[in-house]
Amino acid sequence: MTTKKAYMYVLECVDKTLYTGYTTDLKKRLATHNAGKGAKYTRYRLPVSLLYYEVFDSKEAAMSAEALFKKRKTRSQKLAYIATHQKEKKNH
């Protein structure tokens, strides 16, 4: 049995706020958000753009990463996390 990849993702809304979620189909989920059929939070903040994502081996791992990311309360804390992890990806 193959395990489907899962993603924790961060969107930037048109009003510059950030939205975090998880999915097993990143491209489809982004399209759903931009069609106004995603989370209530993003429906009134369109369009949204993908700012960052991480890949996981399970939905549960992606959900855990989402929860940990959301513990960062301020935009600056979230952007600092993204900047650090994007640098790590480039160095691998």
UniProtKB/Swiss-Prot annotation:
Give the family per the record.
Belongs to the UPF0213 family.
Do you know which PANTHER family this protein is assigned to? UPF0213 PROTEIN YHBQ
What Pfam families does its record include? GIY-YIG (PF01541)
Q: Which InterPro entries match?
A: GIY-YIG_endonuc, GIY-YIG_endonuc_sf, UPF0213_domain
Where are its TM segments located? none
Instruction: List, alphabetically, the SUPFAM superfamilies matched.
Output: GIY-YIG endonuclease
Name the UniProt record assigns to this protein:
UPF0213 protein SPy_1412/M5005_Spy1151
Domain named GIY-YIG: which ranges? 4-80
Can you name the source organism?
Answer: Streptococcus pyogenes serotype M1
